Regions:
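Hydrophobic, small-residue-rich alpha-helical packing segments that form membrane-like cores
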Residues: 337-451
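Extended, well-ordered alpha-helical scaffold segments
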Residues: 138, 145, 212-231, 329-349, ...
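Aromatic (Trp/Tyr) and acidic
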Residues: 12, 120-208, 249-273, 289-326, ...
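Serine/threonine-rich, repeat-prone extracellular segments and beta-strand-based repeat modules
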Residues: 56-111, 871-884, 941-953, 957
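Solvent-exposed beta-strand/loop surfaces of large extracellular or lumenal domains
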Residues: 659-684, 704-710
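C-terminal beta-rich recognition modules with glycine/proline-rich loops and embedded aromatic residues
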Residues: 461, 538-547, 552, 556-640, ...
Length: 963
C-alpha cells in the first residue's frame, strides 16, 4: 500500500492537545500498517513516508528507510521463482531520526505477490496551462527573479548563439560574436547553450508584458529561426546515383566510420563539407560528432566526443518551445519544420545504422558499430539528454502519419535497456549512475508512453520517481554528489565526504546539480498529469521549487548555480551568467520564467490547485479568470473568481507538512472537520461565479527532515573534536528549508532540541513587504536565526547533528546486517575489477573503478572482513559503527575508471599554487591557463573531470610559466 492508499484509511481528526512538558520524551506509539500488493516479477513499491502517531497523540509523516535496498535483495524479490503469485513475505525498515534503536523505529511492510502487472493509467487525466495563461502577481521574490531573468535574457547577443552554426555550415561569421563557455568553438558540447537560449527566449516571450522586451525577444526569435533554416538548407542535396536526397544513413559508411578521428584538426576538415551531413541535419558541430558515438568513443573533448546527442536534444527542445510559445505562425511553422527535419535525420540514422544487441560479452556487443545497448550506457559520452522526449513531442505535433510513426520510432531508439529493464521491475539500477544523464531519459520514457501506450515506459518512470524520493533526495529536493547518484540511503555520508582528501577535515560543500532539480520537477509535473489526485508529486515540486530552484538565482545580479550549496558553511557558487556557460547555466536560463507552470492542472470538469502562490489564471476553455490572492511564501490564500462563471470541481492540495490548523472555507463556510496531509480536498462541482471566495489557511509546521543515514563519528570528528555517531537533519518550516550560519564544524552544527521542537520559536517579521526579501520568515534557537534557504546565500548550513535533549537511552544490539551488505557490494566491485584486469584486450578501455578509490576499498574491505570474523560477542558497537562507516565511505567515494580522482590533481594543484593569484602584470596566457586549471579542478572535484583535462591544464600552465 503506498502513501496515497493508506492516507485514505485515516481521517486526521482535530489534533489533541499537546503535552507541553519538555521533560517528557515524545515517542512513536503507532505506525500505520504498510501492506503492498506486488505484481509477480517485481520488487515491492514501498512508501517513502509513513504516518506515525506519537505518545502525546500528535501525528505526522516520517521518512522510512527500508532494508531491501541491496541490489541482490531486490533482484531476489523480483524473481518469480522465489516469490510466485500468491506468496507473501515481509520487508523490514526503520523510521529514521528516531532514537528507540540505533537504526530508528522498527517497521515492517507486508508484501503480497499478485498475478498481473501494475495498474497504469491509460492516458493523461489532467494538463497544465500555457505559461501565458498563468501570471505571477505582486512584488515578491517570485516576480523579482522572473523580471531579473527576462531582463538578462533580452540582453544576450543573438549573434553569439548563431556563430557556431554559421561556422559549421560554411557561412560567414563576420560581425558575429564568438560563443564562449561550453559553447565555445573548441568545446564539443557546443549547441547545448543555443538550444537552451531558444527555450529561454520562447518562455520569456510568453510571460513578458513589457512591449520593449517583447519586441527584442520577437526580433531574436525570428532571426534565430531564419538563420538556422538557412544553415539546414545546406544539407538539402540530391544524389543522382541514389536518385534521392543524400541522407543520414549515407553519411560515414562503416569503413569510414571505423577510421573516423575525433581531433579538432579532423573537425576543421569536416566542417568544410556540410553537404555530407545528410538531409535535415542541424547542429552547432559537424555530424561526425554524432557518428563517433556509434564507435563507442569515450568522453574526451580533445580527441573524441562530449555527449553528442545531449546538445542535439537541447536544440530540438528549443525549436519546439518556440513553436509552442511564439505567436507568429510563420516562424512557429518554420521552427517546427527545422525540428522535424532534424528529427527525421535522427530516425534515418538510427533506423538504418544502429541496432540493439544485449547478449554476449561487451567485446562481442561492440564488435559492430552502432549497438545502442552499449552507446547509451557510456558515461557522459552516451548522455542523450531528453532526445526521446523531444522526438515524442515532435511526433505529437506533426500531422503526417508516416512522419509521426518515424519520429516515435526514433524516440524509442534512445531507450536504454540496461537501465530501463531493472527499473520496470522496480529494481534500483539508479545507484552509481551519472544523475543528469539518466533523469531526462526517464522523462522521455514517460513522454513516449503517451503515444505508444506500453505500460513498461510508464512503470519505469513511476518506479524511478519513487526510488529517488526516498533513497537519494536531499531536503531541498536535489540529488547527486559529484554529478553521480551514490549508494541508496547514503545522502549524509556523500555530503559530508564530498571531495574530501586525505588529511582534510572540510568536505567540499557544493552538491546537487541544479540540472537534476530542473529535470526532476519536470518529471514530477508530467507524472502528475496521469495521476493528479496524488499530492506527492506537487509536494515534491513545491519543495524543490521553493528551495533549490528559486534559491539558485542570485537576486542581486543575474547568476545561477551549477552545484548547490548543501554542506557545512556553504556559500552558493553563483556564476553561469549565460545559457552556454555550463549545463546548469542552460537550465538556469529557463528556470525562472516558469515558476507558475505547475500551479494549476485541469481537465474538462476539474481544476486542481497544486501550488499556493500569488497568480492569476485565465481558464479560456471555461471562460473564467481565477485570482489567487496571497503573499509568498503563503500561509493563507484566497482564491477568487474575478471574471466569468462556470461549472467545475475544484480540488485543493493539503501539503504534507500541513499538520496543524489547515482550513478551507467556501464563502465563509468550513468544508470539512479534518484534513489529511498530502491529499486533495474535493469541492464538488458547482457553478462558480464572480464573488465566490475560497479561503485556505495553512500555518507552517516546524519539523525535521532527516538524512537517511547517520553521520558517523569518524567523519564528524575529522577536525579533532570527538563526536558520537548521530542522526542529521534539516530544520523545516512548512515547505521551506531553514538554513543557519556560523557553523564551520560538525560540533558547531549541532542542534540541541526537544522531541517536540518546542524550544524552536518563530521570529518576528522583518517588515519588508516587497522585492526579493518580502515576507521573510525566520526561526530562532539558542540565539541562532534560521532563514529560508532561498534567501540565505553565504556561509549557510542546512544539515545539523540532531541531539534530542529529552531522549531516553536505548538498548544496543550488535547487528552485522548493514556491514555484510556493504561487504557483498565491495565483493561485487572487486570481482568486476579483477575480471577487467584479466582481459587481454581491454574492452571497454577503462577499468570499472578508478585506482585510488579501488585500493582504498580493498584495504577497508579486508579490515571489515576481519571484524566480522571475530563474531558478535567480541565486537563493540563503536567498532561496528566505525568499520561500517569507513567501508561505506570507501565505496561511496569510488569513481568510474574513466574519471580522474582527487589524487590525480596533485601536480595541477601545485602548479596553481605556484602561479599564485593573477594581477595586472600577469600575462594573458597565464591568466587563461590559471582560469582553465581552476575550472578543471572544479570538474574533477564535482566528479566529471577526466585525465586528459588535467593533462591539458598542466600543459597550459607549464607553457605559460615557461617550465
Amino acid at each position: 500500500m503506498d502513501l496515497k492508499q493508506f492516507t485514505l484509511l485515516i481521517g486526521v481528526a482535530s489534533l489533541p492537545s499537546l503535552v507541553t512538558a519538555a521533560t517528557v520524551y515524545r515517542t512513536i506509539s503507532k505506525v500505520t500498517a504498510v501492506a503492498v500488493d506486488c505484481p509477480e516479477g517485481t520488487a515491492p513499491r514501498l512508501p517513502n513516508l509513513v504516518w506515525v502517531t506519537y505518545s502525546d497523540g500528535y501525528s505526522e509523516y516520517r521518512q522510512v528507510r527500508w532494508a531491501n535496498s541491496p541490489l541482490a535483495d531486490e533482484q531476489a524479490e523480483a524473481d518469480a521463482q522465489k516469490h510466485p503469485a500468491g506468496s507473501q513475505y515481509e520487508v523490514g525498515g526503520f523510521v529514521i531520526g528516531d532514537e528507540s534503536t540505533d537504526n530508528g523505529y522498527p517497521v515492517k511492510a507486508q508484501i503480497k505477490v499478485v498475478a498481473g502487472g501494475y495498474q497504469t493509467p491509460e492516458k493523461e487525466v489532467a494538463h497544465t496551462f500555457s505559461l501565458a495563461d498563468v501570471s505571477i502577481d505582486g512584488d515578491n521574490r517570485l516576480t523579482h527573479n522572473r523580471d531579473e531573468a527576462i531582463r538578462e535574457i533580452c540582453s544576450w547577443d543573438v549573434t553569439q548563439q548563431l556563430y557556431n552554426y554559421r561556422d559549421t555550415y560554411g557561412l560567414s561569421t563576420e560581425g558575429y560574436t564568438k560563443s564562449d563557455g561550453w559553447d565555445s568553438p573548441d568545446t564539443k558540447l557546443k549547441g547545448h547553450g543555443s538550444g537552451h537560449y531558444m527555450s529561454a527566449i520562447a518562455q520569456a516571450y510568453a510571460v513578458a508584458t513589457n512591449p520593449e522586451q517583447k519586441a527584442i525577444l520577437r526580433k531574436n526569435i525570428t532571426r534565430m529561426v531564419n538563420e538556422l533554416r538557412e544553415c539546414q538548407e545546406k544539407t538539402f542535396v540530391y544524389n543522382k546515383e541514389l536518385k534521392r536526397n543524400w541522407e543520414a544513413r549515407d553519411f560515414a559508411p562503416e569503413a569510414e566510420l571505423r577510421e573516423m578521428k575525433g581531433t579538432w584538426a579532423a573537425f576543421d576538415e569536416y566542417k568544410k563539407h556540410p553537404e555530407l551531413y545528410g538531409y535535415g541535419y542541424i547542429n552547432a558541430i559537424p555530424a561526425q560528432h554524432c557518428a563517433l558515438i556509434e564507435m563507442y568513443r569515450a568522453y574526451n573533448n580533445s580527441d573524441w566526443v562530449w555527449a553528442p546527442y545531449y546538445s542535439v536534444h537541447k536544440q530540438l527542445a528549443g525549436l519546439i518551445d518556440i513553436a509552442t510559445y511564439f505567436d507568429d505562425k510563420k516562424i512557429c511553422d518554420k521552427a517546427l519544420l527545422i525540428a522535424k527535419d532534424m528529427g527525421l535525420w535522427v530516425w534515418n540514422r538510427m533506423h538504418y545504422r544502429t541496432y540493439v544487441k544485449q547478449d554476449g560479452t561487451q567485446d562481442e556487443r561492440r564488435a559492430k558499430p552502432g549497438n545502442r545497448y552499449e552507446m547509451w550506457d557510456m558515461y557522459i559520452a552516451g548522455e542523450v539528454g531528453g532526445m526521446s522526449e523531444s522526438l515524442a513531442r515532435l511526433s505529437e505535433m506533426v500531422s503526417n502519419p508516416d512522419e509521426k510513426a518515424k519520429l516515435l520510432e526514433a524516440a524509442n531508439c534512445f531507450d536504454a535497456p540496461k537501465f530501463y529493464d531493472p527499473l520496470s521491475k522496480n529494481i534500483d539500477d539508479i545507484r552509481t549512475r551519472h544523475a543528469n544523464q539518466h533523469i531526462p531519459m526517464i522523462i522521455g520514457a514517460l513522454r513516449s508512453y503517451k503515444s505508444n501506450q506500453k505500460p513498461y515506459y510508464y512503470n519505469l518512470a513511476e518506479n524511478f520517481w519513487r526510488l529517488v524520493q526516498g533513497r537519494y533526495m536531499y531536503a531541498m529536493g536535489g540529488v547527486g554528489n559529484g554529478e553521480m547518484f551514490r549508494q541508496p540511503y547514503t545522502q549524509i555520508l556523500s555530503m559530508a565526504t564530498n571531495g574530501l582528501q586525505e588529511g582534510e577535515s572540510q568536505a567540499y560543500p557544493d552538491i546537487n546539480e541544479t540540472c537534476c532539480a530542473y529535470n526532476l520537477v519536470k518529471l514530477s509535473k508530467d507524472l502528475n498529469c496521469y495521476n493528479p489526485d496524488n499530492a506527492q508529486y506537487l509536494d515534491y515540486i513545491e519543495r524543490t521549487l521553493y528551495n533549490q530552484i528559486i534559491g539558485s538565482l542570485n537576486p542581486d545580479q543575474y547568476q545561477t548555480c551549477y552545484q548547490y550549496a548543501v554542506g557545512l558553511n556553504a556559500t552558493k557558487p553563483f556564476g553561469n551568467e549565460t545559457p552556454q556557460s555550463t549545463c546548469c547555466g542552460g537550465t538556469g536560463s529557463e528556470n525562472h520564467t516558469k515558476y507558475q507552470q505547475s500551479a494549476y492542472f485541469a481537465n474538462d470538469h476539474t481544476l486542481w490547485v497544486g501550488l499556493y502562490m500569488p497568480t492569476t489564471l485565465h481558464w479560456k476553455e471555461k471562460g473564467v479568470t481565477i485570482k489567487q490572492d496571497c503573499l509568498w511564501p503563503a500561509q493563507h490564500s484566497a482564491i477568487k473568481i474575478t471574471e466569468g462563471e462556470g461549472n467545475f470541481t475544484l480540488k485543493l492540495r493539503v501539503p504534507y507538512w500541513a499538520t496543524q490548523g489547515f482550513s478551507i472555507k467556501v464563502n465563509g463556510k468550513e468544508v470539512a472537520k479534518s484534513y489529511q496531509p498530502s491529499t486533495y480536498v474535493e469541492l464538488e462541482q458547482k457553478h462558480w461565479k464572480v464573488g465566490d471566495v475560497v479561503e485556505i489557511d495553512m500555518p507552517f509546521s516546524k519539523h525535521i527532515e532527516y538524512g537517511a543515514d547517520k553521520l558517523s563519528s569518524d567523519v564528524a570528528s575529522l577536525d579533532g573534536t570527538p563526536l558520537k555517531t548521530s542522526w542529521v537533519g534539516t530544520l523545516m518550516y512548512g515547505p521551506l528549508v531553514m538554513a543557519g550560519t556560523g557553523a564551520q564544524t560538525w560540533n558547531q552544527a549541532t542542534l540541541n532540541i526537544d522531541s517536540r521542537l518546542s524550544n524552536i520559536t518563530v521570529g518576528e517579521s522583518n517588515g519588508v513587504t516587497t522585492g526579493a526579501g518580502a515576507n521573510l520568515l525566520t526561526l530562532k534557537l539558542d540565539g541562532k536565526e534560521f532563514q529560508p534557504d532561498y534567501y540565505r546565500n553565504a556561509n549557510s548550513t542546512h544539515y545539523y547533528r540532531i541531539n534530542l535533549t529529552d531522549a531516553k537511552s536505548k538498548k544496543v544490539k550488535i547487528d552485522f546486517t548493514e556491514l555484510n551488505s556493504l561487504l557483498n557490494l565491495a565483493a561485487e566491485r572487486k570481482a568486476d575489477q579483477e575480471k577487467w584486469n584479466a582481459l587481454s584486450q581491454k574492452v571497454p578501455e577503462y577499468a570499472p573503478w578508478a585506482p585510488f578509490g579501488y585500493e582504498r576499498m580493498q584495504k577497508v574491505m579486508a579490515q571489515a572482513q576481519e571484524l566480522v570474523a571475530k563474531g558478535k560477542k567480541k565486537v563493540t558497537q563503536d567498532e561496528l559503527e566505525g568499520t561500517t562507516a569507513i567501508l561505506n565511505r570507501a565505496i561511496n567515494t569510488m569513481r568510474p575508471g574513466n574519471l580522474a580522482e582527487m589524487e590525480d590533481l596533485r601536480e595541477l594543484s601545485g602548479l596553481l599554487r605556484r602561479a599564485s593569484c593573477p594581477d595586472d602584470n600577469t600575462s594573458d596566457e597565464l591568466k587563461e591557463a590559471i582560469s582553465y586549471g581552476r575550472m578543471v579542478q572544479k570538474y574533477v572535484t564535482d566528479g566529471s573531470g577526466t585525465h586528459n583535462m588535467i593533462h591539458a591544464a598542466v600543459g597550459k600552465l607549464k607553457k605559460a610559466m615557461k617550465q
